[in-house]
Each structure stands twice: as structure tokens, then as C-alpha cells.
């Protein structure tokens, strides 16, 4: 375990929409089994939930959706808790408030998405994970390196099983994204809009914004 680097903090803010320019990676290797449990970010409905903001003053389509949806409202409240806790830390990034305002603008752009609810949900889950991963003093998981059939860029996965949504950070060259556990009939699967990562019997099949990769974990790559 290592302290999360500042490099990941910059890259993750672009993760939700970042798309790579060219493909990457080759060959074969070994098995690094990581078995995430199913995410549990949103509690089951037990009654009305109001978000952290006044729904009578909702200023965007995204906020109106949050006010009408239990799961989104629960995510909004969780984000408000995580953000307030980070903002109160003496070592909090000086631009944290500005970044949060930037995130709100990004969330509100979900009106352009084909699946608006999925877009808003992923925005919340991603922002919560960003704040937790980049929290001062937070421990980051060691990266697992892979050899892929296209070797033009390095490919790694870092797993954060102690965080709310048990996310992973997928890195392909200079592009990064936060992805989340998804149901799988067998093996392990993570994903988000535009990305799918499936690992079964030691081999990973990846779709990274349209780039298809077949990868094998590199033995003894925990300190990459």
C-alpha cells in the first residue's frame, strides 16, 4: 500500500469523459486474482429521501432528477458528507471547492447523454471515489500491471476495495478512468459508460472506449 499520488488526482478528474488517442499492449503472463464484492453505494429504499440541496430551488435537469429518485438522492447525500469531510481537513487541496463547482457543471451536462440517469449516477459515484482516493493520507492500492496483445501503451489496474463502491482505477497509457464492479456470471467484471473490463481464468478482456485488448496480469507487478 502507498499514499495516493498527486498524478492520479489530476488524471481522475478527466476520467469520466477521457478517451485515448491510440491503442496499447501485448503478450502473456500470470494470474492475479482480485475478487471484488458487489457494490453497495446506494442503500435500499426505506422511506423518502431528500438530497443535500433544496429541491424547490433545483437549477438543472440533473438536480430535478436527483430530487425525484431515491438512489440518486442517497448518492447526493453521500457525496455531500464526503466532500464536507475532505473540505474540513487542514491538508485539503486549495482548489477543492473550485473542483467541486467544476464537477457540478459536469454533472449538469448529463442532459446531453442518451441515458441521463446513468450519466448522473456515474458522475456521483465517480466524484465520491475521486475524493476518497485523493484524500490526504489515503492509502492507495498497488497497481497490477498487464501484458496485452497491443503493447504500444502500458496497462494497469489499481483496486480500492476499502472504499464505498469498491472502485478500480484503469490506466491505459496516459488515460485513466474510475470503473466499478458489475455483476458477472463468472470471473470479475468492472465497467462504466464506454469501458468494460472482464477477467476470467487469468485473462482480461478489455474494451477501453472502443479499443479492444486481451491482457494477462504480470507476475510480481504489485509495485508498479
Regions found by a protein language model. Name each.
Residues 17-20:
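Bacterial signal peptide processing site
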Residues 62-94:
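Amphipathic, heptad-repeat alpha-helical segments
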Residues 120, 197-216:
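Short, exposed beta-strand-loop hairpins at the edges of beta-sheets
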Amino acid at each position: 500500500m502507498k499514499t495516493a499520488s498527486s498524478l492520479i488526482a489530476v488524471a481522475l478528474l478527466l476520467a469520466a469523459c477521457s478517451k485515448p488517442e491510440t491503442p496499447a499492449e501485448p503478450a502473456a503472463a500470470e494470474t492475479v486474482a482480485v475478487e471484488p464484492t458487489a457494490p453497495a453505494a446506494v442503500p435500499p429504499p426505506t422511506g423518502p429521501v431528500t438530497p443535500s440541496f433544496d429541491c424547490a430551488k433545483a437549477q438543472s435537469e440533473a438536480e430535478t432528477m436527483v430530487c425525484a429518485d431515491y438512489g440518486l438522492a442517497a448518492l447526493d447525500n453521500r457525496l455531500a458528507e464526503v466532500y464536507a469531510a475532505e473540505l474540513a481537513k487542514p491538508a485539503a487541496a486549495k482548489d477543492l471547492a473550485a473542483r467541486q463547482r467544476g464537477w457540478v457543471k459536469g454533472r449538469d451536462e448529463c442532459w446531453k447523454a442518451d441515458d441521463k440517469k446513468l450519466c448522473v449516477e456515474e458522475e456521483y459515484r465517480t466524484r465520491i471515489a475521486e475524493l476518497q482516493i485523493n484524500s490526504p493520507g489515503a492509502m492507495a492500492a498497488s497497481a497490477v500491471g498487464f501484458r496485452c496483445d497491443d503493447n504500444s501503451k502500458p496497462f494497469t489496474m489499481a483496486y480500492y476495495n476499502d472504499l464505498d463502491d469498491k472502485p478500480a482505477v484503469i490506466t491505459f497509457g496516459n488515460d485513466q478512468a474510475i470503473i466499478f464492479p458489475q455483476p458477472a456470471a463468472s470471473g470479475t467484471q468492472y465497467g462504466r459508460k464506454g469501458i468494460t473490463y472482464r477477467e476470467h481464468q487469468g485473462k482480461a478482456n478489455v474494451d477501453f472506449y472502443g479499443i479492444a485488448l486481451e491482457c494477462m496480469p504480470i507476475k510480481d507487478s504489485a509495485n508498479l
